[in-house]
């Protein structure tokens, strides 16, 4: 990635007019299904935070599986969505300019977030997760609004709230006359140096932010220690639009260095598990602080993030750059699923409460039920309502 030039480029203009990248749509709905999987795991695993939990006593093997799987997902799936969002934000700004760009982001990100905070979230908490007090829904809802509790109740829509902030900041930067440098795919050596530097910056910035922040801290319903990764991936997406990375990064490069990153992450996570305290139930160092465990985990997350991103790009671009009726339907409903899945998933979890299955098996079943129910709710309710324009 050795070719750098400043200013508006022909590549960016071409990206704005390029045919739709169907493999990106397929990555997007795949990541949404992983969101459902994560929240299903939050329901049954010893880790995570969710509206409704149905935890049972788990053995070490089950706890280790959940810890590894959830940490693995957390390391890359939302970051991938931020990268995609940054990529298309750059192209959207090129087409629209500042005011229409920001107005469109408010409509497509702000309105659904407010809908969740004011309607879907309160209904879910009162009628399904039972996390609100007594006194009737209307009473609790007005109390929720009056006391300002709704401002911190973004739920899973924290992603859209954060993305709205990122988009506005990006728009202001572009309005000031600055633009991303064009970093086009070059020789493998130059590209590998850029990637190595990106991994190091991501790991170091995440580690530094997590040093002094409490494990339970939250901004927009997400831990501040995760923001460095999200900001960097959004910025990388905008740079990727300038350099046409989605189509231009060579497949062999993506596979080679994606594999190197993931293979390198395996001994690192093994050391973190064996010697970081997790097997003894001492997990506090994994979340932050000035210690080698937190530093190692931040590096592991960065390796997984970049490695999975490169491999997904190569695999989806080669094998899934097309859509039939089913994949088109899944793609059309992906955002609606993200918006509506909490009450659907929690309702399914309540129905499964008496099922005497292993926690892993129940999480798999809950994922499947939530996916079917959420896609159906999006297709036959949300997309047949006035909300169709924004979901």
Which residues does each predicted region cover?
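Alpha-helical transmembrane segments and their immediate juxtamembrane cytosolic regions
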Residues: 2-391
């Amino acid at each position: 990635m050795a070719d750098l030039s400043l200013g508006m480029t022909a590549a960016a203009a071409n990206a704005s007019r390029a045919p739709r990248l169907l493999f990106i749509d397929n990555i997007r709905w795949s990541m949404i299904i992983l969101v459902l999987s994560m929240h299903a795991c939050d329901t049954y695993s010893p880790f995570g935070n969710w509206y409704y939990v149905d935890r049972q006593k788990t053995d070490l093997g089950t706890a280790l599986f959940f810890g590894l799987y959830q940490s693995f997902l957390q390391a890359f799936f939302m970051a991938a969505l931020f990268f995609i969002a940054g990529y298309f934000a750059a192209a959207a700004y090129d087409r629209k300019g500042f005011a229409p760009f920001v107005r469109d982001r408010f409509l497509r990100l702000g309105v659904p977030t407010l809908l969740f905070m004011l309607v879907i979230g309160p209904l879910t908490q009162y009628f399904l997760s039972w996390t609100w007090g007594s006194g009737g829904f209307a009473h609790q809802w007005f109390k929720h609004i009056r006391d300002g509790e709704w401002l911190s109740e973004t739920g899973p829509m924290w992603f859209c709230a954060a993305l709205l902030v990122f988009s506005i900041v990006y728009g202001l930067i572009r309005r000031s006359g600055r633009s991303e440098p064009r970093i086009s795919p070059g020789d493998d050596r130059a590209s590998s140096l850029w990637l190595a530097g990106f991994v190091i910056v991501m790991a170091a910035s995440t580690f530094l932010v997590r040093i002094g922040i409490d494990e339970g801290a939250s901004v927009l319903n997400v831990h501040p220690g995760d923001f460095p990764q999200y900001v960097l991936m959004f910025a990388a997406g905008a740079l990727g639009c300038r350099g046409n990375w989605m189509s231009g990064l060579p497949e062999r490069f993506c596979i080679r260095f994606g594999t190197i990153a993931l293979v390198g992450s395996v001994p690192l996570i093994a050391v973190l598990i064996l010697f970081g305290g997790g097997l003894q139930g001492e997990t506090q160092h994994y979340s932050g602080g000035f210690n080698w465990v937190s530093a190692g985990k931040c590096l592991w997350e960065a390796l997984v993030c970049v490695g999975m991103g490169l491999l997904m790009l190569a695999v989806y671009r080669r094998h899934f750059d097309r859509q039939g009726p089913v994949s088109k339907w899944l793609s059309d409903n992906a955002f609606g699923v993200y918006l509506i899945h909490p009450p659907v998933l929690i309702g399914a979890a309540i129905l499964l409460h008496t099922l005497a299955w292993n926690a892993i098996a129940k999480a798999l079943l809950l994922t499947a039920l939530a996916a079917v129910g959420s896609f159906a709710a999006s297709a036959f309710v949300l997309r047949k309502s006035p909300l169709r324009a924004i979901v």
